[in-house]
Amino acid sequence: MRKTILDACCGGKMFYFDKHDERVLFQDIRKVSTHLCDGRSFEVNPDIQADFTNMPYEDKSFSMVVFDPPHLLRNAGKSKMADMYGSLNEKASPTGYQQIKYGALYSDWRDMLAKGFKECFRVMKPGGFLIFKWNET
């Protein structure tokens, strides 16, 4: 079966009831298997490991693209979240509950998202659908 849906930043596939949907090509730049601070296991195991700003697909390949990019930008200072999960900065490593689960953005996040949108529209067929999810908290 040819995959007709691309999830460009699938992460832990929390967007899906069926995490093995045969119609979806799951892509993420990360591959992670760990346990979260509350003891739950968490896995990022994409079909394709690739960067959403430079995707390895031909133009007009998918009838639907799901774009749920990393959205963690700030978690610093003396906040409760920083106490619980740590904080991010330009030198942060991919550790800590929130960074592992949600991915992180850095100072060039606007350019990164613009490149991601350009790639999503490039690989989407004419008349296709783009589902964009963003969280600004």
Model-flagged regions — what are they?
Residues 1-137:
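Class I S-adenosyl-L-methionine-dependent methyltransferase catalytic core
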